Structures are given as C-alpha cells and as structure tokens.
C-alpha cells in the first residue's frame, strides 16, 4: 500500500510542511505504509521553487517518505535527495555521492581514465 498525504502549498498554509512531515512519520511508524508526495505541491505560487522542493524532499525523506512525484531533470532537487540519502545512511560510505561529485584525481587522468579536453589533446599530442 502507498499513501499520498496530499501536501498543501506552503504559501497558502504556513504549517503545510510541518503537517506533511508529521503525517508521513505517523504513516511510516504507526502503520508501516509507504508514502509518495508530489514535490512541487509545497512550493506552488512561490519563487525559487526548486530550492523549496529540494528542501522539502530531503526533509520528507528523513521523516519516512519512500517515493516522490518529481522531475528527475531538476538538478537542485536530485542533489537534495542524494544529500538526504547520505545523511540518512541510505548511501553507504557516500558511494553514490562521491561518484557524482568527486572530480578526477591525478591518477585517473594519468592512467587515461579521464579524457583531456580536445584543445589540450591537440597541443600535447
């Protein structure tokens, strides 16, 4: 069973976020059900929606939300979810986070695992 707690816009009801978090926690702890939330509902009508959505998603994940209705192409929201996975112990040893955000090391460049930019290849051969 999956329950959608129907998140209300925070701009219309200031307690919408905290009410959603309380309900998500109760659904998970008391009933053991999975929850799904529409990420953009909370930010409806407000500027900088992706920042609000990302923060909501991270906080909802921390309270027990198991899935979200969202656009995975919104980088700020995906980063917030990945950060929540790190903070909640879902991404063990930060493996996904490091794969996504760690830059190339001198060893990977030297070994050819990272391709040099085209301009640099022409100059060096």
Give residue spans per PLM region.
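Terminal or standalone catalytic/regulatory effector modules within metabolic enzymes
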Residues: 111-125
């Amino acid at each position: 069973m999956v329950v959608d707690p129907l998140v209300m816009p925070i701009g219309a009801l200031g307690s919408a976020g905290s009410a959603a978090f309380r309900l998500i926690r109760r659904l998970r702890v008391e009933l053991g059900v999975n929850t799904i939330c529409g990420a953009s509902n909370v930010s409806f009508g407000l500027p900088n929606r992706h920042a609000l959505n990302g923060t909501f998603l991270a906080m909802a994940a921390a309270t027990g939300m198991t899935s979200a209705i969202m656009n995975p192409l919104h980088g700020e929201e995906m980063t917030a979810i990945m950060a929540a996975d790190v903070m909640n112990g879902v991404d063990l040893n930060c493996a996904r986070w490091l794969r996504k955000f760690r830059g190339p090391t001198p060893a990977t460049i030297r070994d050819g695992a990272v391709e040099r930019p085209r301009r640099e290849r022409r100059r060096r051969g």
